[in-house]
A protein has these predicted regions:
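Short hydrophobic helices that act as membrane-entry/anchoring signals
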Residues: 1-22, 26, 175
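Active-site and donor-binding regions of nucleotide-sugar-utilizing enzymes
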Residues: 19, 23-39, 45-200
Length: 200
C-alpha cells in the first residue's frame, strides 16, 4: 500500500522550508551544493551496486552500527551509509572512508522522503539490504523498499515515549509503515550486537 496522498502533499509544501534550513546552516558553498544534491538530486553515481545499506541518524547511531559495518567491509561487502545530520556524515566518513575500505564504502545524506526522490535513489544504488538503525522511520523509504523487494530491518531500536505518542497521532501512516518492516530486531527482544543478527 502506497503512502497517503496527504503525507506526500505535505512534504512537497515543506520542501522550500527544508531547503532554506539547509542553506542557513551551511558553512561553505561547496558543502551546501553537495548536501542539496544528495538530498534532492540528481544523485551522485553509486560507488558499488548491491551494497548493504545502513541508515543512521547521527553520531550515536553511527557508533552503534560501527561493528556491523566493519564486519561487512572486512568481508569485502560494499556498504552504503546514509545520515540525516552533518555530524553523522562526518563521523561515518572519519571511520570508514579510508584505507582499506575506500573502494567499498560510500556515505551520503538520506534524500528527502518524497516518492520520486526515494524511488530514484533505490534505482541508482540498488541496495541488497536496508538496515535502519534506531527508530528514525520514513514512510516512503520503507514503502519503496517493499516495492523494489529490498529486505528492510529495524535494528537496535529504542522507541521513546515522545516518539510513541507522535506515531500514535498518525496511525494511518505509521501502521502500514511498520507492517512493511520484514524484521524488527528491537533491542529489548533480541540484541543486535553481532554481525550474524543481520546477515542477509
Amino acid at each position: 500500500m502506497a503512502t497517503p496522498f496527504w503525507y506526500n502533499a505535505a512534504l512537497a509544501l515543506l520542501k522550500p522550508i527544508y531547503q532554506s534550513r539547509i542553506r542557513k546552516r551551511a558553512e561553505h558553498p561547496e558543502q551546501l551544493q553537495q548536501e542539496l544534491l544528495e538530498r534532492f538530486g540528481p544523485f551522485q553515481p553509486a560507488k558499488n551496486l548491491h551494497a548493504i545499506w545502513f541508515h543512521v541518524v547521527s553520531v550515536g547511531e553511527t557508533n552503534a552500527a560501527q561493528p556491523l559495518i566493519e564486519h561487512y567491509l572486512k568481508a569485502g561487502q560494499p556498504v552504503l551509509v546514509t545520515k540525516t545530520t552533518k555530524t553523522g556524515q562526518a563521523r561515518a566518513k572519519s571511520l570508514f572512508l579510508k584505507a582499506p575500505y575506500l573502494d567499498l564504502f560510500q556515505a551520503v545524506y538520506l534524500p528527502a522522503d518524497q516518492v520520486h526522490l526515494i524511488r530514484e535513489f533505490y534505482q541508482k544504488y540498488q541496495p541488497k539490504l536496508l538496515a535502519l538503525v534506531e527508530t528514525e522511520l520514513w514512510p516512503n523509504l520503507i514503502d519503496q523498499a517493499q516495492h523494489f523487494q529490498v529486505p528492510c530491518l529495524l535494528i537496535n531500536a529504542r522507541l521513546s515515549e515522545k516518539s510513541a505518542k507522535g506515531y500514535a497521532k498518525v496511525k494511518g501512516l505509521t501502521r502500514g509503515m511498520l507492517q512493511k518492516l520484514q524484521a524488527n530486531l528491537a533491542k529489548a527482544a533480541k540484541p543486535a550486537t553481532t554481525p550474524s543478527a543481520v546477515n542477509p
